[in-house]
Protein backbone atom coordinates (compact mmCIF):
# COMPACT_ATOMS: atom_id res chain seq x y z
CA UNK A 1 0.00 0.00 0.00
CA UNK A 2 1.40 3.41 -0.98
CA UNK A 3 2.39 5.68 1.87
CA UNK A 4 0.16 8.73 2.16
CA UNK A 5 1.66 12.20 2.23
CA UNK A 6 1.73 13.61 5.77
CA UNK A 7 -0.79 16.39 6.47
CA UNK A 8 0.43 19.97 6.26
CA UNK A 9 -1.98 21.27 8.91
CA UNK A 10 -1.99 19.92 12.45
CA UNK A 11 -3.76 20.66 15.71
CA UNK A 12 -5.20 22.67 17.24
CA UNK A 13 -2.63 22.32 20.02
CA UNK A 14 -2.14 24.26 23.22
CA UNK A 15 0.85 26.58 22.95
CA UNK A 16 2.47 27.53 26.21
CA UNK A 17 2.77 31.16 25.19
CA UNK A 18 0.34 31.87 22.35
CA UNK A 19 -2.82 30.01 23.29
CA UNK A 20 -4.76 27.71 20.98
CA UNK A 21 -2.76 27.26 17.81
CA UNK A 22 -3.42 25.65 14.44
CA UNK A 23 -0.08 24.69 12.92
CA UNK A 24 1.01 24.72 9.29
CA UNK A 25 4.02 22.59 8.34
CA UNK A 26 5.91 23.90 5.31
CA UNK A 27 8.03 20.75 5.14
CA UNK A 28 5.73 17.87 6.10
CA UNK A 29 7.68 15.06 4.41
CA UNK A 30 11.07 15.50 6.06
CA UNK A 31 13.23 17.78 8.17
CA UNK A 32 14.72 20.62 6.12
CA UNK A 33 16.75 23.07 8.18
CA UNK A 34 19.94 25.10 8.03
CA UNK A 35 20.56 24.24 11.70
CA UNK A 36 20.90 20.87 13.44
CA UNK A 37 20.17 22.03 16.99
CA UNK A 38 21.07 19.63 19.77
CA UNK A 39 17.69 20.24 21.41
CA UNK A 40 15.60 19.66 18.26
CA UNK A 41 12.74 17.21 18.83
CA UNK A 42 12.61 16.35 15.11
CA UNK A 43 15.79 14.28 15.19
CA UNK A 44 19.24 14.71 13.68
CA UNK A 45 19.66 15.85 10.07
CA UNK A 46 22.42 17.42 8.01
CA UNK A 47 21.87 21.20 7.80
CA UNK A 48 21.03 22.46 4.31
CA UNK A 49 21.24 25.81 2.52
CA UNK A 50 17.88 25.63 0.72
CA UNK A 51 14.80 23.41 0.64
CA UNK A 52 15.16 20.30 -1.48
CA UNK A 53 11.43 19.46 -1.44
CA UNK A 54 9.05 22.40 -1.91
CA UNK A 55 5.33 21.96 -1.39
CA UNK A 56 3.03 23.95 -3.69
CA UNK A 57 1.48 27.13 -2.33
CA UNK A 58 -1.93 26.04 -3.59
CA UNK A 59 -1.66 22.82 -1.59
CA UNK A 60 -0.95 24.77 1.58
CA UNK A 61 -3.73 27.30 0.99
CA UNK A 62 -6.33 24.60 0.34
CA UNK A 63 -5.26 22.64 3.42
CA UNK A 64 -5.46 25.73 5.63
CA UNK A 65 -8.89 26.73 4.32
CA UNK A 66 -10.20 23.21 4.82
CA UNK A 67 -8.85 23.02 8.37
CA UNK A 68 -10.33 26.40 9.32
CA UNK A 69 -13.71 25.42 7.89
CA UNK A 70 -13.73 22.26 10.02
CA UNK A 71 -12.68 23.77 13.34
CA UNK A 72 -14.96 22.89 16.24
CA UNK A 73 -13.36 25.36 18.65
CA UNK A 74 -11.93 28.87 18.11
CA UNK A 75 -8.18 29.31 17.80
CA UNK A 76 -5.95 32.22 18.76
CA UNK A 77 -3.19 31.91 16.20
CA UNK A 78 -2.27 30.28 12.92
CA UNK A 79 1.33 29.20 13.35
CA UNK A 80 3.62 28.82 10.35
CA UNK A 81 6.38 26.36 11.14
CA UNK A 82 8.20 23.49 9.47
CA UNK A 83 10.03 20.27 10.04
CA UNK A 84 13.03 22.57 10.02
CA UNK A 85 13.25 26.28 9.17
CA UNK A 86 10.16 27.94 7.60
CA UNK A 87 12.05 30.90 6.11
CA UNK A 88 13.76 28.43 3.77
CA UNK A 89 10.38 28.07 2.04
CA UNK A 90 10.80 30.05 -1.22
CA UNK A 91 7.12 31.09 -1.52
CA UNK A 92 6.61 32.38 2.02
CA UNK A 93 5.51 35.87 0.95
CA UNK A 94 2.94 34.54 -1.51
CA UNK A 95 1.60 32.15 1.13
CA UNK A 96 1.11 34.68 3.92
CA UNK A 97 -0.44 37.26 1.59
CA UNK A 98 -2.85 34.64 0.27
CA UNK A 99 -4.10 33.35 3.61
CA UNK A 100 -4.40 36.55 5.65
CA UNK A 101 -7.66 37.72 4.02
CA UNK A 102 -9.66 34.71 5.25
CA UNK A 103 -8.24 34.40 8.78
CA UNK A 104 -10.98 36.65 10.25
CA UNK A 105 -9.16 38.04 13.28
CA UNK A 106 -6.89 35.05 13.86
CA UNK A 107 -3.32 36.21 14.43
CA UNK A 108 -0.47 34.93 12.31
CA UNK A 109 2.72 33.66 13.92
CA UNK A 110 5.93 32.29 12.45
CA UNK A 111 8.53 30.34 14.41
CA UNK A 112 12.01 30.87 12.96
CA UNK A 113 15.63 30.41 13.94
CA UNK A 114 16.34 33.96 12.74
CA UNK A 115 19.26 32.94 10.56
CA UNK A 116 17.94 34.41 7.28
CA UNK A 117 16.53 37.72 8.53
CA UNK A 118 19.21 39.56 6.54
CA UNK A 119 17.64 38.48 3.22
CA UNK A 120 15.32 41.19 1.76
CA UNK A 121 12.88 38.57 0.43
CA UNK A 122 12.60 36.98 3.87
CA UNK A 123 12.15 40.37 5.53
CA UNK A 124 9.34 41.25 3.13
CA UNK A 125 7.48 38.05 4.02
CA UNK A 126 8.06 38.34 7.77
CA UNK A 127 6.65 41.88 7.82
CA UNK A 128 3.25 40.39 6.93
CA UNK A 129 3.04 38.37 10.17
CA UNK A 130 1.42 39.64 13.37
CA UNK A 131 4.02 37.86 15.50
CA UNK A 132 7.55 36.85 14.56
CA UNK A 133 9.39 34.63 17.00
CA UNK A 134 13.06 33.89 16.44
CA UNK A 135 15.63 31.86 18.32
CA UNK A 136 18.88 33.26 19.65
CA UNK A 137 20.58 30.58 21.71
CA UNK A 138 24.12 31.87 21.52
CA UNK A 139 26.31 34.74 20.37
CA UNK A 140 29.53 33.29 21.70
CA UNK A 141 30.79 31.47 18.58
CA UNK A 142 31.85 28.28 20.35
CA UNK A 143 28.47 27.99 22.08
CA UNK A 144 26.65 28.84 18.82
CA UNK A 145 28.40 26.02 16.96
CA UNK A 146 27.75 23.55 19.79
CA UNK A 147 24.07 24.26 20.36
CA UNK A 148 22.79 25.12 16.86
CA UNK A 149 25.24 23.23 14.61
CA UNK A 150 24.50 25.66 11.74
CA UNK A 151 25.07 25.39 8.00
CA UNK A 152 26.61 28.87 8.08
CA UNK A 153 28.67 29.91 11.10
CA UNK A 154 28.56 33.65 10.35
CA UNK A 155 26.90 34.74 13.60
CA UNK A 156 27.63 38.42 12.93
CA UNK A 157 25.67 38.31 9.67
CA UNK A 158 22.76 36.67 11.50
CA UNK A 159 22.81 39.34 14.22
CA UNK A 160 22.93 42.13 11.64
CA UNK A 161 19.91 40.61 9.92
CA UNK A 162 17.88 40.41 13.13
CA UNK A 163 18.82 43.97 14.06
CA UNK A 164 17.91 45.30 10.61
CA UNK A 165 14.57 43.50 10.59
CA UNK A 166 13.69 44.80 14.07
CA UNK A 167 13.96 48.36 12.75
CA UNK A 168 11.40 47.86 9.97
CA UNK A 169 8.98 45.44 11.63
CA UNK A 170 5.73 46.81 13.10
CA UNK A 171 4.40 43.63 14.72
CA UNK A 172 5.28 41.73 17.87
CA UNK A 173 8.90 40.55 17.77
CA UNK A 174 9.70 37.82 20.29
CA UNK A 175 13.05 36.20 21.00
CA UNK A 176 13.44 32.72 22.40
CA UNK A 177 16.61 31.75 24.23
CA UNK A 178 16.79 28.04 24.96
CA UNK A 179 19.49 27.17 27.47
CA UNK A 180 21.27 23.86 27.86
CA UNK A 181 23.30 23.12 30.95
CA UNK A 182 27.01 23.40 30.33
CA UNK A 183 26.58 24.37 26.67
CA UNK A 184 25.22 27.91 26.29
CA UNK A 185 24.40 28.98 29.86
CA UNK A 186 27.73 30.66 30.61
CA UNK A 187 27.75 34.17 32.02
CA UNK A 188 29.64 35.40 28.95
CA UNK A 189 27.09 34.05 26.48
CA UNK A 190 24.14 35.33 28.52
CA UNK A 191 25.68 38.80 28.76
CA UNK A 192 26.25 38.91 25.00
CA UNK A 193 22.67 37.85 24.22
CA UNK A 194 21.15 40.28 26.71
CA UNK A 195 23.25 43.19 25.44
CA UNK A 196 22.21 42.49 21.85
CA UNK A 197 18.50 42.14 22.64
CA UNK A 198 18.52 45.41 24.56
CA UNK A 199 19.63 47.18 21.39
CA UNK A 200 16.73 46.03 19.22
CA UNK A 201 12.98 46.59 19.15
CA UNK A 202 11.80 43.47 20.96
CA UNK A 203 8.51 42.82 22.77
CA UNK A 204 9.53 39.86 24.90
CA UNK A 205 12.22 37.30 25.63
CA UNK A 206 11.05 33.74 26.20
CA UNK A 207 13.71 32.07 28.31
CA UNK A 208 13.46 28.30 28.44
CA UNK A 209 15.31 25.02 28.70
CA UNK A 210 14.84 21.47 27.48
CA UNK A 211 11.31 20.21 28.16
CA UNK A 212 10.93 17.59 25.42
CA UNK A 213 12.97 14.65 24.10
CA UNK A 214 15.75 16.01 21.85
CA UNK A 215 18.10 14.93 19.05
CA UNK A 216 21.22 14.80 21.20
CA UNK A 217 21.91 14.38 24.88
CA UNK A 218 21.06 17.85 26.15
CA UNK A 219 20.84 18.42 29.92
CA UNK A 220 18.14 20.80 31.09
CA UNK A 221 18.45 23.58 33.65
CA UNK A 222 16.50 23.45 36.88
CA UNK A 223 13.86 26.10 37.54
CA UNK A 224 16.22 27.81 40.00
CA UNK A 225 19.07 27.80 37.47
CA UNK A 226 16.83 29.22 34.77
CA UNK A 227 15.63 31.92 37.14
CA UNK A 228 19.25 32.90 37.89
CA UNK A 229 19.98 33.10 34.17
CA UNK A 230 17.02 35.44 33.72
CA UNK A 231 18.75 38.02 35.93
CA UNK A 232 21.15 38.75 33.06
CA UNK A 233 18.17 40.08 31.09
CA UNK A 234 17.25 42.82 33.55
CA UNK A 235 15.43 45.64 31.77
CA UNK A 236 13.82 43.33 29.21
CA UNK A 237 10.39 41.73 29.38
CA UNK A 238 11.35 38.14 30.21
CA UNK A 239 8.91 35.24 30.26
CA UNK A 240 9.64 32.10 32.27
CA UNK A 241 6.37 30.23 31.76
CA UNK A 242 5.51 26.90 33.26
CA UNK A 243 3.27 24.46 31.45
CA UNK A 244 -0.26 25.45 32.46
CA UNK A 245 -2.17 22.20 32.67
CA UNK A 246 -5.28 23.76 34.24
CA UNK A 247 -5.83 25.96 31.16
CA UNK A 248 -5.89 23.03 28.77
CA UNK A 249 -9.14 22.12 27.05
CA UNK A 250 -10.22 19.07 25.08
CA UNK A 251 -9.15 20.49 21.75
CA UNK A 252 -8.31 17.41 19.73
CA UNK A 253 -10.77 14.92 18.34
CA UNK A 254 -8.94 12.74 15.85
CA UNK A 255 -8.42 9.27 14.45
CA UNK A 256 -5.48 7.06 15.26
CA UNK A 257 -3.50 8.02 12.15
CA UNK A 258 -4.01 11.74 12.79
CA UNK A 259 -2.91 11.30 16.41
CA UNK A 260 0.24 9.48 15.32
CA UNK A 261 1.01 12.29 12.85
CA UNK A 262 0.50 14.86 15.60
CA UNK A 263 2.84 13.05 18.01
CA UNK A 264 5.41 12.59 15.24
CA UNK A 265 5.63 16.38 14.95
CA UNK A 266 5.38 17.27 18.62
CA UNK A 267 5.89 14.87 21.56
CA UNK A 268 2.81 14.93 23.77
CA UNK A 269 3.10 15.38 27.53
CA UNK A 270 1.51 12.51 29.44
CA UNK A 271 0.21 15.12 31.86
CA UNK A 272 -1.52 17.10 29.11
CA UNK A 273 -2.83 14.16 27.08
CA UNK A 274 -6.09 13.53 28.99
CA UNK A 275 -6.81 17.26 29.01
CA UNK A 276 -6.31 18.10 25.34
CA UNK A 277 -7.57 14.85 23.78
CA UNK A 278 -11.20 13.81 23.79
CA UNK A 279 -11.92 10.34 25.27
CA UNK A 280 -11.82 8.50 21.94
CA UNK A 281 -8.54 10.10 20.88
CA UNK A 282 -7.05 9.40 24.30
CA UNK A 283 -7.84 5.67 23.93
CA UNK A 284 -5.80 5.60 20.73
CA UNK A 285 -2.64 6.22 22.77
CA UNK A 286 -2.82 2.75 24.30
CA UNK A 287 -3.32 1.20 20.86
CA UNK A 288 -0.31 3.05 19.47
CA UNK A 289 1.79 1.95 22.45
CA UNK A 290 0.71 -1.68 22.10
CA UNK A 291 1.57 -1.65 18.40
CA UNK A 292 4.95 -0.04 19.20
CA UNK A 293 4.22 2.97 17.01
CA UNK A 294 4.90 5.33 19.89
CA UNK A 295 6.86 5.07 23.11
CA UNK A 296 7.09 6.94 26.41
CA UNK A 297 10.21 8.98 27.14
CA UNK A 298 11.10 10.76 30.36
CA UNK A 299 12.62 14.25 30.46
CA UNK A 300 13.36 15.32 34.01
CA UNK A 301 10.18 14.65 35.97
CA UNK A 302 7.94 14.76 32.86
CA UNK A 303 6.86 11.91 30.59
CA UNK A 304 6.09 12.28 26.89
CA UNK A 305 4.47 10.17 24.21
CA UNK A 306 6.93 10.10 21.29
CA UNK A 307 6.91 8.49 17.86
CA UNK A 308 9.66 6.03 16.96
Task: Annotate each predicted stretch with a short phrase.
Residues 88-225:
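Conserved AdoMet/S-adenosylmethionine-binding subsite of the radical SAM
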Residues 2-17, 28, 62, 71, ...:
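Auxiliary Fe-S-binding modules of radical SAM enzymes
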Residues 16-59:
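Canonical Radical SAM [4Fe-4S] cluster-binding loop centered on the CxxxCxxC motif
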Residues 19-21, 37, 75, 131, ...:
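Structural motif
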Residues 43-79, 90-94:
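Conserved alpha-helical substructure of the radical SAM core
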Residues 79-85, 113:
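Glycine-rich beta-strand-to-loop/alpha-helix junction loops that act as flexible
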Residues 27-29, 42-43, 137, 178, ...:
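Generic beta-structure capping elements
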Amino acid sequence: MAKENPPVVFGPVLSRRFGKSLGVDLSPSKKQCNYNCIYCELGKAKPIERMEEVIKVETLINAIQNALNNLTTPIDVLTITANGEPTLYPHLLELIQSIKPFLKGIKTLILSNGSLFYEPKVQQALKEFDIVKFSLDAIDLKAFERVDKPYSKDINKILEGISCFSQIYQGQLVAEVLLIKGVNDSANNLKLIAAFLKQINIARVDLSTIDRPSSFKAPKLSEDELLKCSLFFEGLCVSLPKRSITQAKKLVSCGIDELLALISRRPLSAEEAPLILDPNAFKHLETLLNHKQITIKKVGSLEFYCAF
